[in-house]
A protein has these predicted regions:
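Terminal catalytic/cofactor-binding subdomain
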Residues: 2-105
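Arginine residue identity/basic-tract feature
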Residues: 6, 32, 99, 107, ...
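Aromatic/basic-lined ligand-recognition segments
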Residues: 75, 130-164
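Histidine-centered divalent-metal-coordination microenvironment in nucleic-acid enzymes
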Residues: 75, 109-125
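Short loop/turn segments at secondary-structure transitions that flank enzyme active sites
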Residues: 84, 124, 149
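Intrinsic-disorder/low-complexity, polar/charged segments
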Residues: 84-87, 111-112, 128
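Intrinsically disordered, low-complexity coil segments
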Residues: 88-89, 105, 124-137
């Protein structure tokens, strides 16, 4: 739908571009921070839906933002700022966000297009670079050793896994 110049200038796109990466805001107190990227699909790449989900999550703080994702057919990615596990479970209103997303027609687990990505800050792995590198190498060893089980757990096809 075309907009007049004034409306176009006032229009706020609630869905950021794929490459959007704001300055992280860390929530909670602790050593480990987790950022969540939840892909949802089948409900539309819709500004009003994105705004509604953000209004649930961002009542007091900017906890989430929403991004485009080219791997999705008709949805977007809900991205949290880094938070401690306690903040995610006690302060973030994930249950209401997800309930509303489902009510809007979004799906995640029940699709072949969506994924859940958890980012962890490097300092969670140790107090210095040597400790961090040691833990990261053990994680890589675990992934290599248990690749077949992780592949099954991921629910990805061989084609999708090769793209990853």
């Amino acid at each position: 739908m075309p907009y007049c110049e004034r409306c176009f200038d006032e229009f706020e796109d609630e869905i950021e571009e794929y490459g959007y990466k704001p300055t992280p805001i860390f929530y909670g107190n602790g050593k480990r921070y987790f950022g969540v990227e939840l892909e949802v699909d089948e409900g539309g790449k819709d500004n009003d839906n994105a705004a509604a989900l953000k209004s649930i999550a961002n009542v007091h703080e900017e906890n989430i933002y929403i991004k485009s994702d080219g791997s999705l057919e008709d949805g977007f990615e809900i991205v949290s700022h880094p938070m401690t596990l306690e903040y995610h479970t006690e302060e973030m209103n994930w249950k209401e966000i997800l309930r509303e997303a489902v009510a809007m027609g979004y799906r995640s687990h029940q699709t072949s297009t969506c994924g859940l990505h958890i980012h962890v800050n490097r300092n969670a792995f140790g107090d210095n670079q040597a400790e961090q590198e040691d833990v990261i190498s053990r994680i890589l060893f675990f992934v290599e050793k248990h690749w077949n089980e992780l592949f099954t757990f991921s629910r990805r096809s061989s084609y999708n896994m090769s793209r990853w």
